[in-house]
Amino acid sequence: MAITPDDLRAAGAVIDAAGSVREAAATWRTRDPAMRVLVVDAHDMRDETPALRLGLRSVYLATSNGHCWSVTGQPELATALILTQH
């Protein structure tokens, strides 16, 4: 399941409106149960480039080979969103 530009815009709106990234993740999971959404500490993502920045919040795209996760800059390969708050 790829993440489309519309998905990313919609996720950005949800994340921007939420009181916290955890709340945003819960809202997005309810809205799109097929999409994996993870919340991690911003420090863990310090060497990665976000797909989207929303003030103190960042959204990263991730993909999995079934065993390992990796951050990707290619939405067509992404199967998950990773959210952080600085």
Each model region followed by its residue ranges:
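Negatively charged, low-complexity tracts enriched in Asp/Glu with abundant Ser/Thr
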Residues: 1-40
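Conserved N-terminal glycine/acidic-rich loop preference
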Residues: 4-5, 15-18, 46-61
